[in-house]
């Protein structure tokens, strides 16, 4: 070997030392002759590429260790990579697979779905150098080929492999199980390697301690592994930044998961937090005892864990592999006081985006502490009342129901000290003060300036600085521009005030926000021994709000800018006073012109009128329901605040609170309440006046007021204590109890972070972002007594304990929700439903009803009428009847089709009787009640043997019990699918039936979802310049979810209040999402809260009835006359024959593209596998496709294995009951089995025994056990009936079908492709498919539309261009063998503009593109698009002017 070669080997060994692998002996045979052939350093891009010559390709673990070691060792210098150059390039499948994870792992960062697909498999190797991977579909194949294939081959090449080729293998259905097993085995193999490493460490530890780690049964605290000593050093999770060999951490478990591996072992994975950070902990079971012990580790436990911290390639984060886990006593806050307090000011997650702890957790805490009562006081809402009531019952707490309201005075005065002075001739003294703060009591004036104005001219000026006697704060200097030098040595305040009082004389005093300036002046006058000013006063702020309510704000600088008034330096008294003077004169003139106001004592004549409530500044007050009357009054106030007085927030005028005061208790609330503000800003006298309105006074812990000190609104903690002591004195003097409340927004101090994230997400819109959030956790009695120790021990106990319980004792035990159902009453409803049912039955089945018909009717009517449900049927009948009269079919949803009375009253088209023939002429009938026929529609055509008339075919064989329960006492849930076009009409009709005051949209509450919370946390992490570990992000996300974000309305739910009650007996009322222009009001409570108390009608909007109506209009065919067993239509569900195209033409083996329920790729695959030929089999398909674990891994396997055929498998929930009864089981047991299976509860041993005793097949029993959710057969039958009708048009009237499909169901179009024909459409489809998983939602929706367009083109039809004079606004028009698209199919052209174009052309042809743009209100972009598409041929750009 040459010296140069030796040097290269030495360099390699030096490299191994630098990266910490000098002692790796396992791979010595691979490294001993290795050498660094060259190092390519790119200074510009800071990269180093090591070219290593080695005898043979490295084992994957060695390559990985070197790669990680180099990246870590040189991370501060350059990015590194290796190029292995082996002498021997022999490879095999084992080596290919060993490297696979390393090669594809980075792909997951770019495309998690493709990364997961590749990581969950191993490639196969085929000579000479081919690797093959499995994919599920074309999109996956295209994505891998285009984005990742070259990189995979390149990465193998860097590891020294010869040039590989790669191809994809499409999995068919039969291989899916094999693939899943393959992926599972692959994952377990990776975990096994990690487990082996853990076992080695555990073995060493056991040897060192001469003990064993066999786990004991859980008779005491949980423990796996060794006992961790009490004095062992605990590392904070927030201090773990890198891999560490052996450390101990502790924390609270907030998520657990146990995975059973095929090896028989278990993997325990849980997440813990110590509130400095969070971490994933993993542990593999060593034996069965460990595996059993894993089950005892629960969320909410505190544990101490010892193990090693390492980077986990699966989660791409630091995790701990645990060796020892010990349960420990958790960090628990106690309340040790003998006498307990009660919390009277507490927010739940229903305080919008402001409070985070659940009602249950807060109430549990109160109960654990031994408190006897707790109040709910969410911001303006009662939406947590139902949950709070339930939690109170659960934990034995008395619940006080209240709100923290936004109270307003009915009208804010414009003028004070009214005097009959002419406004046009008066002399005005316009002044402004600059102060050291907002409190007239604790702060002082540092500048006082004024100007005198008469007839719009300034005639005199006053200006003076005042020395405060102490340095100015930075805030004051920054806000006012006044410095210490400017005020130092100025006259003292008494001298300046005396001069100003003399100067202002008896003139009208004017200020912008006069209540503030006059408050300071009058308080200052009193301090220096002068009398308060009794001058007439005008407030320009309130006058501007009155005159210009539409302005966005009414700040001085905004108004002066609006009216071109010079304001040289805002927040300097002299400049503000002069600008205010000119503004005042402008306002005085406008007041005369707009409202004929001429005198000072007329300025308040309009106070409180119109939108005056919008101008009032809200302050907080707590309002509690003391009695049932008070609860109803509270509901009325909440309604009023949302319906009549909503402006940015719900507002309650003081006058309305006075009117509805009976049964209510009112408290002074927090720092935003008027009592605290009065004491802080105006002093004792003002506070004494304010407190007269309230029943009790609230004070809160000093930390709750911390933002006031931070913002310098309160000088310091000493000043805050003085304010609170004075409030206590005011209470004593007024004889009103002072209560210490917590203003609780979360349970524990550590929960503060969740609120911080939520408030941060709202940005500058939330004023709470102006300062650090206060500590507002739920405080124990001990903590509260400590907070108020500055009042003295006796007084602290009085406000914390005695008075809080005193207020609790004022309150009665209340129930905010009812126990019973209150349905509306319609006189004679019972007789009408009975008569309608029998009349229709006789009309169909003859005067002498068949026994099966009469028995079913009587059975149902007994339940319906006996339980008071007749009115529900009657209402539903009226709604459906009106829709039918107006020309729109109604589809039924859910299980209403299980009711024969619903069929007879025309609520549903589904007939639930056993399959039967029915003669429309002589009324003869023939029933098949032995289970031999699945649906009456499947019976062969037959003539009546009595009169020769063709039989009608009916009956879907559905038991009534699936609708109202076995006893017939379940509240009927009648869901009706109206046309989306007709839905608003149906909704409005309920107002006609019941009256507008008795029908409301069902309210919903939108809470922060996990995905949204994740965004909030990530934004917080970014804005705070933090790096948060994945497990900690999960914890923070969980803490932010479930908080109220908005309100809304159920898409079709209408709540009906009986006319013998009013809505306030059940719920307050509001507008959805605070949209005060909404046509409908909603229930304030989420409708689920009152679902069992009032009737809810589900009047839903659906495309199917809309499509049927359009098809009827186009064809003139009554959809009810369409046969349900048309042979060509049935062929559609198994082939493309009926369409006259080949499967390759439309890329589908069935013809169901665009058929509701049967057009998705998933259902089309089911059709291909099952090949249904009858209506009942289509119902089976519908049930199978909507259920959970009904098809996949269940019925699919049974059919594939030929265990049974499609008609025999369990498709819908009702099938179970019917089949079991036919098998001989007692009907009540059959019903119980059906209910248990459909709810995913499986079968009990007793159920299995009964089924086996009645010879139910074993496969049927096993199938029942797998099911998690099932679809009702009536729902499936109704859907299939609509689908078959629409399919009829597709087969026999294709252009009607396509025109309807594109009009009703499609939103996204590519008109360019569609107009240019089949090849253009296919090219666009390929473009979308080639994007694979990266295709957008809009592109995926377009793909569906293009599939239908392609099919239409394949059948010989075509699309025309949008036609300026033929196109409709929003419907596709048939023209010969083609369709003309509507205007709203043009990208970005909305329906309103489309209608405007149509309206404009009716008034005459367009003269030019310019004319189209002006009269049609069309944008230039749309004009350009239409021009490019050739829609505007012959139309000049501009109007032509002719002289002749």
Curated annotation (Swiss-Prot):
Functional summary from the UniProt entry: Required for replicative DNA synthesis. This DNA polymerase also exhibits 3' to 5' exonuclease activity.
Annotated catalysed reactions: DNA(n) + a 2'-deoxyribonucleoside 5'-triphosphate = DNA(n+1) + diphosphate
Enzyme class (EC, first level): transferase
Exonuclease domain: residues covered: 428-584
SMART domains for this protein: EXOIII (SM00479), POLIIIAc (SM00481)
The protein's name: DNA polymerase III PolC-type
Organism the protein comes from: Listeria welshimeri serovar 6b (strain ATCC 35897 / DSM 20650 / CCUG 15529 / CIP 8149 / NCTC 11857 / SLCC 5334 / V8)
Polar residues: compositionally biased ranges: 207-216
Primary localization: cytoplasm
Keywords: Cytoplasm, DNA replication, DNA-directed DNA polymerase, Exonuclease, Hydrolase, Nuclease, Nucleotidyltransferase, Transferase
GO cellular component labels: cytoplasm
